[in-house]
């Protein structure tokens, strides 16, 4: 895919890997929607890159819909890069007792459920795209981690969330390939 002129959403784009991804896409000529919960940083980056900002908690359906609508208003949505995520270090049983279930669920909800939320909403928009001359309608990229295969002590929640990303990518890719939308995961 020629990135120049294409519209991409990058989640978690106000900092870290997401910010680096947004900067790389913009440097290649993409129009980038910075989708993040960090409004001040996200708005500043969007201004700097000539893109747009969408206040987006990836776990919230309405926020995801708004980010996709923002992207579609800029042109044909051709890419989603899921970088939003959190990591906590907490042993299954530590000196203060059992791993907090709420913390485990929070990591799964943001890293895995949030990624799926954005994939399904972006894919819906991409399915409506007229194919590019190459036949493509878009690309869906989710950030996994080596922790999906080799998580360390204290990384149960993070490793499970990234294992989920790896596990859901192939079935999504198989289905999306029928309409020429690519789905991939990779180590961040």
Predicted regions and their residues:
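The beta1-alpha1 cofactor-binding region of Rossmann-like NAD(H)/NADP(H)-dependent oxidoreductases
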Residues: 39-40, 56-66, 101
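Active-site loop-to-helix junction immediately N-terminal to the catalytic Tyr of the SDR YXXXK motif
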Residues: 150-159, 168-171
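Alpha-helical segment proximal to the catalytic Tyr-Lys
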Residues: 124, 174-178
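Active-site helix of classical SDR
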Residues: 119, 161
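Catalytic Tyr-X3-Lys loop
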Residues: 78, 86, 97-117, 140-141, ...
């Amino acid at each position: 895919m020629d990135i120049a002129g294409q519209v991409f959403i990058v989640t978690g784009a106000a900092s870290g890997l997401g910010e680096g991804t947004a900067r790389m896409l913009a440097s290649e000529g993409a129009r980038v929607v910075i989708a993040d919960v960090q409004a001040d940083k996200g708005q500043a980056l969007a201004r700097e890159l000539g893109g747009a900002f969408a206040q987006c908690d990836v776990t919230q359906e309405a926020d995801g819909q708004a980010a996709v609508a923002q992207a579609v208003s800029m042109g044909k949505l051709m890419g989603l890069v899921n970088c939003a995520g959190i990591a906590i270090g907490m042993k299954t049983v530590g000196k203060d007792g059992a791993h907090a279930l709420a913390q485990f669920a929070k990591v799964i909800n943001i890293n895995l459920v949030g990624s799926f939320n954005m994939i399904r909403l972006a894919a819906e928009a991409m399915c409506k795209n007229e194919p590019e001359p190459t036949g493509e309608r878009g690309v869906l990229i989710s950030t996994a981690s080596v922790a999906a295969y080799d998580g360390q002590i204290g990384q149960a929640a993070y490793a499970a969330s990234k294992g989920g990303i790896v596990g859901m990518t192939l079935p999504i890719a198989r289905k999306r390939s029928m309409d020429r939308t690519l789905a991939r995961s990779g180590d961040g």
